Amino acid sequence: MARVGPPLDRADERPEVFAMSPHPDGSTASRCGPTPSGFPVADRPWSVETHGIDVVPDGDRHGKPTDLLWLWSAANLGVIGIVYGAVVATLGLDLLQAVAVTVVGTAGSFLLVGVLGIAGQRGGEPMLALSRRLFGASGNVGPSLVSWVSLVGWETVTAIVAADALLAIVPSLTHGPAGRWSAVVALAVTTGLSLAVGRLGHATIIVVQRAVAWIFGIATLALVGDLAFRADWARAAARHPAPFGAVVAAASVVIASAGLSWVNVSADYTRYLPRGARGRAIVGWTTLGASTPLVVLVVLGYVLSSPTSTLASSPNPVEALRSGFPGWAVVPYLSVAVVGLLAQMVMGLYSSGLNLLVLGIRVRRSRTVLIDALVVLSVGGWFMVAPHDFLGSFVSFVELLACPLATWAAVFLVDMLFGGSRDEPRTAWPAGGSWAVGTAVGLLFTASPLFTGPLARGIFVGSSLGYFAGFLVSAALFAAVRAGTVVRRGREATTTRRSVSGELPPR
């Protein structure tokens, strides 16, 4: 049914309304069309975005695929990429293997993110809202809940690392230690900064990420250049090749840490693109923007580490890397680290808020990010203050969610290959069943500190290949179902056509 509410002239005065359907969209009735600034009233920089999970009308579509280059570049400037490189080093790969695994794993996984982004440009809805066309409103609860927990979980981990970096700036400037409760204050600052941008919405995020990509991208390049100049490249080049199993394990780690962790948000940032935007441009700029900084950081992390390095297992990787810089570069390094991590948080916070709307939380989009920020602040504050060792287990739990996210992406990708679903299905069992079976199979082959499946043996030990097995199973099952549906409909159409033409007697 149509949304209600008269169009008003000012976006900040328009009451946000919900679609008259079982799920809210958190949208606001808006006047379509661009303002003199080139942005539509519903999505202007430094104003609260008024669309929720409703379909973005053609009059509100704006931007170009090259915007994705800066958006994804900023999101992958975080120093966590250096830690991924350290993990690759601990698996014993030589330099050539490490570079190949990093390039192929990073570009390949973000290629999937770019392809899924085409669905957002075509459908005009966020990622998990589009998923309802496959799973149905009730069947989509599972994937949406997994997506939300994964996003909020990684936001919490990122906020903690950013807060640690912010705390490290204090003794660098004052030559004194930060207080015990300073950790909570630092966490509140990092979360608050992310909230301020995420609350405003899509257009503001695009503008901010572009600035971050340019300004802090150059700063990151300078700091990376300093590290690369002082790195022991001869030691890295002298390493011996690792066996095939180690290469596969390293590739699985890179894929899971790179694009796979973003598959559930891709359409959130392409739904405003004009319908005339080319799909190849969406895929290309997404892949290039995300892969370029991350490949550089991962390879650098590999060179800086050794098979016995403690960087990969450090509870505070920012502090561990800090010792590699001269005194004058410590504060600039920490500042760049904080901003790079905040750029990741902003995108996660915005998308997790959209996920809450898909789950049926009946509040404005601009308020869903506040709910997520409170969760991040509460959970993150507990981890930073309380004396416990649960953070490692929490990270392992969030990493486990890569399996159901991968299987969901497999189902969605297959549906796109078959032309996409335009309406919610009569039954959700084909998509939901394929997702559930693939997830179960993937977990059977998964090995992690928190959970080890009964079939996680051989090459599956010490790798993240479980999600890959689940991906293949879900894709194969759903492809078989969709192919069967296409064949059946083709036969029905042929029978109907022959009946109408008189070749067959009527039933």
Language model regions located:
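Hydrophobic alpha-helical segments and their helix-loop junctions in multi-pass secondary transporters
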Residues: 159, 164-167, 214-240, 255-260, ...
